[in-house]
């Protein structure tokens, strides 16, 4: 009975959520698009001509937002976006116009090599401008286990960013407040010159979800 009440309450909140309604109205696949939009509005992450990699992209709302932002550039002509968006996820994702999608686990060498090649082609052999990651583990409710899973996904994004970002590039990842959060922030500070946390209004009030932003890579000794 309690579970049914919880499900009914969640469904009621979801249906009446203004961001859900906005996403439906504006054609986004998930309300998460507005989390990225709020952060982008504040920090001016997405700029014309950028090459952007979206880790853990499904169902695709972040890729949609990034694509739309690049398409709005005055330099976008003949139906093409001004820049490139490369998305990857273990889960399938319906195509997004102008977005190159790879389905697979980028921890696997073959998939990683494919991702690297697509990024190289998109950037003309250069490094990339922005990595965004909305990856999240399946949470168990066991704090220590969940903290380790969250930190692991952040480490994957950090490693990818270190290897592929331009010196002036940025990394945005989803994280959760709790055990292990301070360690993740410290890792960002070791890797980036500027580090900030963001809690957009589109994040649900009851959620411990937050986003960590790193900008300007530090040189590797």
Curated annotation (Swiss-Prot):
Pfam families in the record: FtsJ
Keywords for this protein: Cytoplasm, Methyltransferase, rRNA processing, S-adenosyl-L-methionine, Transferase
Catalytic activity, as annotated: uridine(2552) in 23S rRNA + S-adenosyl-L-methionine = 2'-O-methyluridine(2552) in 23S rRNA + S-adenosyl-L-homocysteine + H(+)
MF terms in GO: rRNA (uridine-2'-O-)-methyltransferase activity
Subcellular compartments: Cytoplasm
Keyword Zinc recorded: no
Sites where the protein binds S-adenosyl-L-methionine: 60, 62, 89, 105, 134
Gene3D superfamilies referenced in this protein's UniProt entry, alphabetically: Vaccinia Virus protein VP39
InterPro entries per record: RNA_methyltr_RlmE (IPR050082), RNA_MeTrfase_FtsJ_dom (IPR002877), rRNA-MeTfrase_E (IPR015507), SAM-dependent_MTases_sf (IPR029063)
Enzyme Commission code(s) on record: 2.1.1.166
Domain of life of the native organism: Bacteria
Cellular compartments per GO CC: cytoplasm
Active site: residue positions: 174
Protein task: Specifically methylates the uridine in position 2552 of 23S rRNA at the 2'-O position of the ribose in the fully assembled 50S ribosomal subunit.
Similarity field: Belongs to the class I-like SAM-binding methyltransferase superfamily. RNA methyltransferase RlmE family.
Record-given protein name: Ribosomal RNA large subunit methyltransferase E
Gene designation: rlmE
